[in-house]
Regions:
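Gly/Pro-rich hinge or "lid" segments in bacterial periplasmic/extracellular proteins
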Residues: 162-231, 235
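Detector for C-terminal structural segments
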Residues: 309-339, 385-395, 422-534
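Surface-exposed binding/hinge segments that line
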Residues: 125-183
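N-terminal lobe/hinge region of extracytoplasmic solute-binding protein
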Residues: 33-81, 200
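Structural transition elements
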Residues: 326-365, 386-388
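Ligand/substrate-recognition segments at binding pockets and active sites
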Residues: 212, 356, 361-435, 450, ...
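Ligand-site clamp/hinge motif
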Residues: 224-269
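Aromatic- and charge-enriched surface segment that lines or borders ligand/interaction sites
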Residues: 76-128, 296
């Protein structure tokens, strides 16, 4: 699930006393989160905290296993599309059940897709279903939701028809296409997925003792899950911990079994907990969105000035200190390779470089174009240590450009930040974006008209034309597709529709008492695959 993420140290980790007993069968796994879970409604969630929870409690047709391979879930097998790659027909398991014991049906998927796309839902995730036939007409209200290219052929047979072939669609199926419990939705209405009393689950766990304002919640094994006998961790307790120092202290005291840390703590943690420190590259981009509705931040030369002022290597090495790496483009390293086997970014031009001379040159141009000597920009961030550190670094770099570049920082809770971004109540900000399928288009869409989270509302005809060419897969080889994507990324580096900052690394502290808990490049760790060591 492509999602908004925290910068630097991300979402995962917990709290409570570790057992010294070797019998861990009833032991609660304790971890932490940096933010609250906002919703477990798969049609509405946009943030990493919510989608980490959803990935544990809701399963779709396919899923990714612990090695990142696509495997069947509610569908009985991985199907081959027909109709020139546009039609997928799935038979569903008869033993897939919701946590109330009722069966998951094809109608639950149809209801979910229609609800996510229809305009009255106002889902920021609607665009993830944009490949389905008649999406545009339904999403704009020109056609009824019943016209969307999805049908329940029978109680346990589902058909999805796309408007065009999509080469990575198995990943979309595994990470974006989730059912909703139709009966629960009819009963609960707008309360669906907003607290644990109104949360439907067909996955390995169900969420308990939770609402969007609570700092603690628990995942409890779902006894109706079709694979429940393979789920070893029976209970997972989460506690919101916003500072890495507190997370480290809790792990040192054995009050938690897993947490995520960042910054200067990483080096010491590696020494103290060598066998329990897990460093993983993560397919997640940190970037600056610019509000294109505002004259100041719409100015290309101002955006270029700040981009050139940011020393991404120094930011990663001296501020984050957690293995994060400088962004080369809007697409993270490792997402995809070109025909020669080289990383995608090897073919991207207009490199993101640090050059104060150029930064000052473009700032002067911005002053002239805006008719202002002093330029004020407020940078919106979430209120965590990692966010604040990155924002303060950017603020200091702006001052190096000119005393007249007045960049101020406003730190607020992530939920409010997302709300302000959605309402365009910002100048610029800091955000993270992750995807769940190995194709650059989801990152390139951060600056396209169809972008799910294009808060900037930035558009450019030349850029959009390339995006449209990328999306026209009918007469396109994989090599041609990658070249078009590299062309788009190169243009975006030049035009700064968004300003890439760095690629996340995740550093987790994980108890030696557990095995099978992995941190993938794409997607989220899955607790159903973890187990206590005997």
């Amino acid at each position: 699930m492509s999602s908004i993420a925290l910068l630097g140290a991300l979402v995962l980790s917990g709290c409570g006393k570790s057992s010294s007993s070797k019998d861990n069968s009833n032991r609660t796994f304790k971890t932490t989160a940096q933010t609250n879970v906002i919703t477990v409604d798969p049609n509405r969630a946009t943030d990493v905290g919510s989608y980490l929870a959803i990935s544990q409690v809701v399963e779709g047709l396919y899923k990714q296993n612990n090695q990142g391979k696509i495997v069947p879930s509610v569908a009985t097998k991985i199907v081959k599309p027909t109709n020139n790659g546009k039609t997928y027909t799935f038979n569903l398991r008869h033993d897939a059940k919701w946590n109330d014991g009722s069966r998951v049906t094809a109608g639950d998927f149809v209801a979910s897709f229609r609800r996510q796309v229809e305009p009255k839902t106002k889902s920021q995730r609607a665009g993830h279903l944009s490949d389905i036939k008649n999406y545009q007409e339904v999403n704009t209200g020109k056609a009824s939701p019943s016209k969307l290219g999805v049908k329940a052929l029978s109680k346990y047979k589902l058909q999805i028809t796309l408007s065009r072939p999509v080469p990575y669609y198995n990943y979309v199926i595994a990470t974006q296409l989730f059912p909703i419990n139709q009966k629960d939705l009819a009963k609960w209405g707008s309360k669906y997925g907003q607290d644990s009393e109104h949360a439907a689950s067909d996955g390995a766990y169900e969420i308990k003792n939770w609402n969007s304002s609570k700092d603690t919640w628990t995942l409890v094994k779902n006894k109706h899950y079709y694979n429940a006998d393979k789920v070893d961790l029976k209970k997972i307790h989460f506690q919101v911990v916003k500072t890495p120092k507190t997370s480290l202290r809790l792990f040192q005291a054995k009050d938690i079994d897993e947490t995520q840390i960042s910054g200067s703590l990483v080096a010491d943690a590696k020494k103290q907990f060598k066998s329990e420190t897990v460093v993983s590259k993560y397919g997640q981009l940190a970037f600056i969105p610019w509000n294109n509705y505002r004259k100041t931040t719409r100015n290309l030369n101002l955006r270029r000035a700040l981009s050139y002022a940011i020393d991404r290597k120094s930011l990663a090495k001296n501020v984050l200190k957690d293995g994060s790496t400088p962004a080369q483009s809007v697409v993270p390293e490792g997402e995809v390779k070109d025909a020669s086997g080289k990383d995608f970014n090897a073919g991207v031009t207009n490199k993101l470089t640090y050059n104060l001379t150029k930064a000052r040159y473009y700032f002067k141009l911005a002053q002239q174009e805006l008719g202002q000597k002093k330029i004020n920009v407020q940078l919106l961030t979430a209120d965590t240590d990692a966010y604040k550190a990155v924002a303060e670094y950017i603020q200091a770099q702006a001052q190096k450009v000119s005393p007249d570049f007045n960049l101020t920082v406003r730190s607020i809770p992530l939920q409010q930040e997302i709300s302000d971004f959605s309402a365009h109540k910002f100048d610029a900000g800091t955000l993270g974006w992750s995807t769940d399928f190995p194709d650059p288009i989801d990152y390139l869409n951060l600056a396209s008209k169809a972008g799910v989270i294009n808060f900037t509302k930035w558009t450019n005809p030349k850029y959009q034309k390339i995006i449209d060419q990328i999306n026209d897969t009918t007469n396109q080889t994989p090599e041609q597709r990658v070249k078009l994507q590299q062309k788009a990324a190169s243009l975006l580096n030049n035009l700064q529709g968004v300003t890439p900052l760095y690629q996340y690394a995740s550093v987790h502290l994980r108890t030696k008492d557990v095995k099978g808990l992995e941190y993938p490049l794409i997607g989220y760790q899955k607790y159903e695959y973890a187990s206590w060591k005997k």
